């Protein structure tokens, strides 16, 4: 008798004769897609083809979507951390640190490994998987801590022969079973050398991950392909693909098996060729079967369009050859031009091989602050500066606010949005990546990177709010106090305003398109993850089918072993395809999606720069000129009056007013010239983003070809293995 009502036994995957008569409170009937052949026939279906049973609930067009959504939310909250043994929490942290991990959650590959190494039948594995992993929502991407707790509890119940229902889990809340899994044992053995000296100190959340790989997202997406075999085994491994990219070497590690034997995954056959001018290096083999490196942290390094140029000047703003573009916008040249120099709309850009600075941002697991006023901290690390500081999200907001006041006519990067009570793993990961893009765009900007506020933000080790109280901070407009050079205005091209309007129009349209592209690619990646989960369901269902094949064809069982071998081969290759799909979706999120978001942020920041120009670049020169004319007439009139008819000091007062107005006109005119020069320089900086577009398209196309080849190899291998299945001929 359950606290939430009786829960009749489920129709077994092959060994139970009870029939489910009603739904439990938690709507935890497993989807038959992952159950055995005998599961769907005993659910009280009135249809000949069982088209009103659990299969219907797995349809996205079904009216039971609300029921499935409620179950999905229930799995997350059924077993909070306070109700589970320490071994559950340790197991989750262990898998996050040593196993497959997607963002800040446990990936489906690790879920499959835990199930397959638990000694359960394929039917029980399929039932548990379908209970814990819903067909929609974030669980198709991986399991959070609450879902993982339910997974372990269900495995423990199955090993003890108990019912596999949420009611059964709730009944055992006070004394949850301790599951056994050889996969978790292997992870513990692997972690043993680096175990902490004080085992009694158990982290409730994953420890801060190490510094991230300092590569752009396109390079990180290629790293997930680096260990898929040698260059000779990959006909698509062009050395040109990796020219100019720095790949991080990782320590080799034995690959993690997936429970179905040696299955070819998306990260055991990629290759990496060095550039023509580089020495070819040995491909690292420390990637897991899902494409992740050891201890892959929940962090990423700066990347995207800013990280792919490799042409920043040596900290002198826009001076030197960078400014020799946009007509005659830059400093005077030597009078000689390269014959092959490209010029579009009068823009010419020279490049440099200087390596750009990269900043990593890690989300720290512990919250700080009083109850109801807690906040999360981020570890901001700069390898070039050798600094590591702790910052809050509000610190980033303060920095951007100061930069907007001081540099309103610069290409200021975008901050991810703030959301109240948003602690979901997906939102926190998106915000962290947005902070990575923001910080790296700052340090790669020729002017903003030299700003004292930015330097202090990245290097002051104390809490920023404390430093702000002690420091003298200036947020004056960058043009305040500057003297207009005599030749600057003449050096600007006459059609500069027309170029500004042309670029602004193109940027506005491009930004809208890239916003839509990011949304579409996120949707494609989610579909790939959902497709991977369904492939795993299909694989588990086929395995459970082999358990009843002998009984189904009991009249003559001679061909059953060969039949089961073919079915298991299909299950193995479906599992392999699931790994490939999951790896590809992850590569999209870390690679092409981040590249598109960098390009989107770049375009939106330029669009906002033009919007700020409309608001802040105004002047009142026409009004001042009219007032000067009026005061000059008044001054002439005063001077023509008799000496006693003029009040003392009135003439001096009018003269001072005229002088101040003329001085204001000169200052406002100079400021207008500075604004034009500033925006011109920003467009020269922005011009480099076109080359990032080329790289992201090249990288993504190569990635798609490689994964397509791997999928083709996988299904070709399956075709060979099922060739010998009995045909009754």
Curated annotation (Swiss-Prot):
Keywords: Cytoplasm, Membrane, Protein transport, Transport
Sites where the protein binds a 1,2-diacyl-sn-glycero-3-phospho-(1D-myo-inositol-3-phosphate): 392, 394, 418, 431
Domain of life: Eukaryota
Pfam families: PX, Snx8_BAR_dom
Region (Disordered): 1-43, 177-340
Span of domain PX: 356-464
GO cellular component term of the entry, any: endosome
Membrane-topology annotation of the record: Peripheral membrane protein
Gene Ontology biological process terms in this record: protein targeting to vacuole; retrograde transport, endosome to Golgi
One GO molecular-function entry: phosphatidylinositol-3-phosphate binding
SUPFAM superfamilies to which the protein is assigned, alphabetical: PX domain (SSF64268)
Subcellular location: Cytoplasm; Membrane
Function recorded in the entry: Required for vacuolar protein sorting.
Recorded domain comment: The PX domain binds phosphatidylinositol 3-phosphate which is necessary for peripheral membrane localization.
Family: Belongs to the sorting nexin family.
PANTHER family to which the protein is assigned, alphabetical: SORTING NEXIN MVP1
Protein name: Sorting nexin mvp1
Organism: Aspergillus fumigatus (strain ATCC MYA-4609 / CBS 101355 / FGSC A1100 / Af293) (Neosartorya fumigata)
């Amino acid at each position: 008798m359950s606290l939430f009502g009786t829960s009749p036994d489920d129709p077994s995957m092959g060994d139970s004769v009870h029939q489910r008569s009603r739904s439990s409170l938690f709507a935890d009937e497993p989807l038959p897609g992952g159950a055995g052949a005998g599961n769907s026939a005993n659910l009280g279906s009135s249809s000949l083809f069982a088209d009103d049973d659990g299969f219907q609930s797995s349809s996205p067009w079904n009216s039971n979507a609300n029921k499935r959504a409620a179950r999905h939310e229930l799995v997350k909250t059924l077993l909070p951390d306070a109700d589970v043994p320490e071994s559950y929490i340790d197991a989750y942290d262990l898998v996050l640190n040593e196993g497959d991990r997607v963002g800040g959650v446990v990936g489906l590959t690790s879920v499959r490994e835990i199930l397959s190494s638990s000694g359960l039948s394929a039917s029980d594995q399929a039932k548990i998987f379908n209970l814990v992993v819903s067909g929609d929502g974030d669980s198709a991407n991986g399991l959070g801590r609450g879902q993982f707790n339910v997974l372990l509890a269900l495995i423990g119940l199955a090993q003890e022969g108990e019912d596999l229902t949420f009611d059964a889990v709730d009944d055992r809340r006070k004394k949850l079973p301790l599951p056994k899994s050889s996969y978790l044992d292997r992870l513990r053995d692997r972690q043993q050398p680096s175990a902490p000296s004080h085992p009694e100190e158990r982290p409730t959340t994953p420890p801060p991950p190490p510094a991230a790989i300092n590569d752009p997202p396109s390079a990180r997406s290629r790293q997930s392909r680096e260990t898929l075999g040698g260059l000779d085994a990959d006909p698509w491994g062009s050395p040109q693909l990796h020219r100019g990219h720095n790949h991080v070497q990782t320590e080799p590690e034995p690959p993690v098996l997936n429970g179905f034997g040696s299955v070819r995954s998306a990260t055991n056959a990629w290759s990496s060729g060095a550039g023509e001018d580089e020495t070819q290096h040995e491909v690292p083999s420390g990637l897991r079967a899902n494409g992740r490196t050891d201890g892959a942290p929940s962090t990423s390094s700066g990347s995207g369009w800013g990280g792919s140029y490799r042409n920043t000047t040596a900290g002198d703003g826009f001076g030197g050859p960078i400014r020799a573009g946009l007509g005659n916008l830059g400093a005077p040249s030597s009078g000689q031009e390269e014959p092959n120099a490209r010029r579009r709309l009068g823009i010419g850009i020279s490049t440099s091989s200087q390596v750009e600075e990269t900043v990593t941002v890690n989300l720290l697991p512990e919250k700080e602050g009083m109850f109801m006023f807690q906040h999360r901290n981020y570890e901001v690390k700069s390898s070039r500066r050798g600094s590591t500081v702790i910052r809050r999200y509000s610190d980033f907001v303060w920095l951007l606010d100061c930069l907007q006041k001081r540099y309103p006519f610069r290409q200021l990067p975008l901050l991810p949005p703030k959301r109240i009570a948003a602690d979901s793993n997906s939102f926190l990961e998106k915000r962290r990546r947005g902070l990575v893009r923001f910080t790296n765009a700052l340090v790669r900007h020729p002017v903003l990177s030299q700003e004292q506020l930015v330097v202090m933000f990245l290097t002051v080790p104390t809490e920023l709010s404390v430093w702000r109280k002690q420091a003298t901070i200036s947020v004056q407009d960058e043009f305040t106090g500057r003297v207009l050079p005599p030749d600057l205005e003449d050096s600007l091209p006459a059609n500069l305003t027309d170029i500004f309007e042309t670029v602004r129009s193109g940027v506005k349209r491009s930004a809208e398109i890239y916003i839509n592209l990011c949304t579409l690619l996120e949707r494609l990646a989610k579909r790939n993850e959902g497709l991977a989960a369904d492939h795993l369901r299909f694989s588990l269902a086929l395995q459970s089918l082999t358990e009843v094949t002998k009984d189904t064809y009991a009249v003559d069982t001679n061909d059953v072993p060969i039949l089961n071998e073919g079915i298991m081969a299909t299950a193995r290759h479906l599992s392999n395809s699931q790994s490939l799909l999951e790896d590809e979706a992850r590569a999209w999120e870390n690679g092409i999606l981040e590249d598109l978001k960098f390009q989107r942020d770049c375009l939106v920041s330029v669009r906002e720069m033009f919007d700020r120009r409309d608001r802040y670049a105004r002047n009142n020169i026409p009004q001042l000129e009219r007032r000067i004319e009026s005061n000059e007439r008044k001054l002439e009139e005063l001077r023509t009056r008799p000496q006693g008819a003029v009040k003392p000091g009135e003439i001096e007062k009018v003269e001072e007013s005229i002088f101040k107005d003329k001085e204001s006109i000169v200052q406002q005119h100079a400021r207008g010239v500075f604004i034009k020069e500033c925006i011109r320089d920003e467009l020269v900086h922005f011009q480099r983003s076109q080359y990032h577009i080329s790289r992201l398209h090249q990288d993504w196309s190569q990635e798609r070809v490689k994964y397509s080849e791997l999928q083709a190899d996988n299904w070709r291998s399956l075709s060979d293995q099922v060739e010998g299945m009995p045909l009754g001929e």
